[in-house]
A protein has these predicted regions:
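Conserved beta-strand signature within the Rossmann-like core of class I S-adenosyl-L-methionine
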Residues: 151-158
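A short glycine-rich, Lys/Arg-flanked "PGG" loop and its adjoining helix->strand segment in the class I
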Residues: 138-150
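Acceptor-substrate binding/catalytic loop of class I
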Residues: 163-179, 202-204
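Conserved class I S-adenosyl-L-methionine
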Residues: 19-59, 61-70
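Class I SAM-dependent methyltransferase SAM/SAH-binding core
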Residues: 71-113
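Conserved S-adenosyl-L-methionine
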Residues: 189-200
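A short acidic, Gly/Pro-enriched loop at the edge of an enzyme's catalytic core
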Residues: 112-123
Length: 218
């Protein structure tokens, strides 16, 4: 079980630089202020193709961490499919909404606070860790690898591109295949099983592209 009892929203953790803390808090503040709107716009989006593309690599009943669960859409899908599922998010309001929607206790935590060891067969980080600065990602990928069991599976996705910075109240690190390849070489913990580009599935946003990947722990 993920322990979030130490989280203090008003205090910068020792491991976070001042600039990174500001970036993260700005994004979390956005989600706290727009939690209902965000949940309503994402909860009913048809995402079965992606979910099943991840689940095919897992055994029935495997243990999954929904890492940055947002509205709880994917957590509920995994639970309904019979998978043991934990969920975590950094936004207090989204944690409240997702807990009510999924019926489980969603944990409040920063991505950087993941400290589980070989606890999960799969980690689902869908459109979540993209809010970290690029320089924060290597450490978080290493922590995700540590949290996975032997040859565990990670799905994650990023907006497609090379930009990094604040957009409309949130911080984004965009990714291309080349940028991700470099990051994964530095991390040296995962093999790439699949990497592909898709269009946004939300109405009116098909022009937005996403880089998706399924990785296996070495």
């Amino acid at each position: 079980m993920i322990d979030s009892s130490h989280v203090n929203r008003g205090q910068r953790p020792d491991y976070l630089g001042k600039e990174a803390f500001v970036f993260m808090n700005d994004s979390l503040q956005y989600y706290n202020q727009h939690a209902k709107e965000f949940s309503d716009s994402t909860r009913d989006v048809e995402f079965k193709e992606m979910q099943e593309r991840f689940l095919v690599y897992l055994k029935p009943g495997a243990r999954i961490l929904d890492f940055g669960c947002g509205s709880g859409r994917d957590t509920k899908y995994f639970l309904d499919r019979g998978f043991e599922t934990d969920a975590a998010d950094g936004s207090e309001e989204l944690v409240r909404i997702a807990s009510g929607y999924t019926g489980i206790e969603v944990r409040l935590m920063y991505f950087q606070d993941l400290d589980e060891k070989e606890a999960y067969d799969g980690i689902w980080a869908c459109s979540s860790i993209l809010h970290l600065a690029y320089r924060e990602l290597e450490d978080v990928f290493i922590k995700m690898a540590r949290a996975l069991t032997s040859h565990g599976i990670l799905y994650t996705s990023f907006k497609y591109g090379t930009a990094e910075g604040e957009r409309n109240g949130r911080y984004f690190t965009d990714m291309t295949e080349e940028k991700m390849d470099k990051l994964l070489k530095d991390v040296n913990s995962f093999d790439i099983l699949e990497m592909w580009v898709t269009s946004d599935v939300r109405p009116g946003r098909a022009e937005e592209k996403w880089l998706n990947m399924i990785l296996r722990k070495k």
